UniProtKB/Swiss-Prot annotation:
This protein's encoding gene: murB
Cofactor(s) named in the record: FAD
SUPFAM superfamilies, per the entry: FAD-binding/transporter-associated domain-like, Uridine diphospho-N-Acetylenolpyruvylglucosamine reductase, MurB, C-terminal domain
Pfam families, per database record: FAD_binding_4, MurB_C
EC number: 1.3.1.98
UniProt KW keywords: Cell cycle, Cell division, Cell shape, Cell wall biogenesis/degradation, Cytoplasm, FAD, Flavoprotein, NADP, Oxidoreductase, Peptidoglycan synthesis
Protein name: UDP-N-acetylenolpyruvoylglucosamine reductase
Family: Belongs to the MurB family.
Gene3D superfamilies: 3.30.465.10, UDP-N-acetylenolpyruvoylglucosamine reductase, C-terminal domain (3.90.78.10), Uridine Diphospho-n-acetylenolpyruvylglucosamine Reductase, domain 2 (3.30.43.10)
GO biological process: cell division; cell wall organization; peptidoglycan biosynthetic process; regulation of cell shape
Length: 337
């Protein structure tokens, strides 16, 4: 295990932003992780996973610990369900494909989401009607201060829309090392409630979709709308879809009757942030090397040599204009560093 100094993080964040780490080390086992934490107790630390949900606006004046724990295994099963444990450093999409290849259901709608397994509970990632909380059983984590292992159950994670205990009450206190999911072995609950998925399946004349069919449909949709970070730096959806009280939404809807929305409860509706941003005139707009993607207004992109600050400035301009136009605040889903 070698600590490197003045280390470039350009290849460790999907925006492809050039930023330096004061110190950097990759860890490949829980034992290595505990040792590094113990030996560097008084150093400032920054924990790095897949780098897919962050915007680096400056160099990191800390010891960057890259979690590169690999491996996955079935830890329990019965006739109907299987409990699978994945190490935190596994690439999420590869893990999803592995579950589908084994005919384990529950994650297929979240195919092609960038990032690693370890960050999935932090954000409670989700797509096309499913979220991590639907299949999440528990995760194992190391206390940064004491190096003790703690298991967080689903209930203890306080999951909300792109929220969890790891973004709030215990933020920066734990490092997730593995995650356990409970998946179906039969009687899969195929979720094709989103119109895009139904349209993609219909295009391929599929009326009774398998897990693989749904995954392929989601992959096709995402590839048509979202740029590949290897070709164009981005972090997927930069903004959360705002959730409004119905009473507030009704007032706004009177002014903008064409506004799209989805009911999330008896008292709340979700408005697509991408629609708001597009209507505000930002879709495809470019500011130097930073901009809003031409096919999906939720996505901010680095066209080459944008700095994190330049991308942040674009996001602030988008937020300001959307609020001035619609009276709706949109929040960043990405962690700004």
């Amino acid at each position: 295990m070698e600590i490197q100094s003045n280390f470039s993080l350009k290849n460790y964040n999907t925006f492809g932003i050039e930023a330096k780490a004061k110190q950097f080390i990759a860890v490949h086992s829980v034992e290595e992780l505990k040792t590094i934490l113990k030996e560097n107790k008084n150093e400032k630390k920054f924990i790095l996973g897949g780098g897919s949900n962050m915007l680096l606006t400056k160099d990191i004046d800390a010891l960057v610990i890259h979690i590169d724990l690999k491996g996955k295994e079935i830890i329990k099963e019965d006739d109907d369900f299987v409990w699978v444990e994945s190490q935190a450093g596994e690439t999420w999409h590869d893990f999803v494909l592995w579950t589908i290849d084994n005919n384990f259901g529950g994650l297929e709608n979240m195919s092609l989401i960038p990032g690693n397994v370890g960050t999935t509970p932090v954000q409670n990632i989700g797509a096309y009607g499913t979220e991590i909380k639907d299949t999440f059983v528990s995760c194992n984590a190391i206390n940064i201060e004491t190096q003790e292992t703690k298991t967080f159950t689903n209930a203890e994670c306080n999951f909300g829309y792109r929220e969890s205990i790891f973004k709030n009450e215990v933020k920066d206190q734990f490092i997730i090392t593995s995650v356990i999911y409970k998946l179906t072995k039969r009687n899969h609950k195929i979720n094709t409630s989103y119109g895009d998925i139904l349209a993609e399946l219909a295009k391929n004349n599929i009326s009774e979709p398998t897990l693989k069919d749904v995954s392929n449909a989601v992959i096709a949709i995402r590839q048509s709308k979202l740029p590949d970070p290897k070709e164009l730096g981005n972090s997927g959806s930069f903004f959360k879809n705002p959730i409004l009280l119905k009473s507030d939404f009704e007032q706004i809807h009177k002014k903008f009757p064409e506004m799209k929305f989805y009911e999330v409860s008896e008292t709340e509706v979700k408005v697509p942030a991408g629609w708001l941003i597009e209507q505000a005139g930002f879709k495809g707009k470019r500011f130097g090397d930073a901009g809003v993607h031409k096919n999906q207004a939720l996505v901010l992109v680095n066209y080459g040599n944008a700095t994190g600050q330049e991308i942040l400035n674009v996001s602030k301009e988008v937020q300001k204009t959307v609020f001035e136009t619609f009276g709706i605040k949109i929040e960043a889903e990405v962690n700004v560093i």
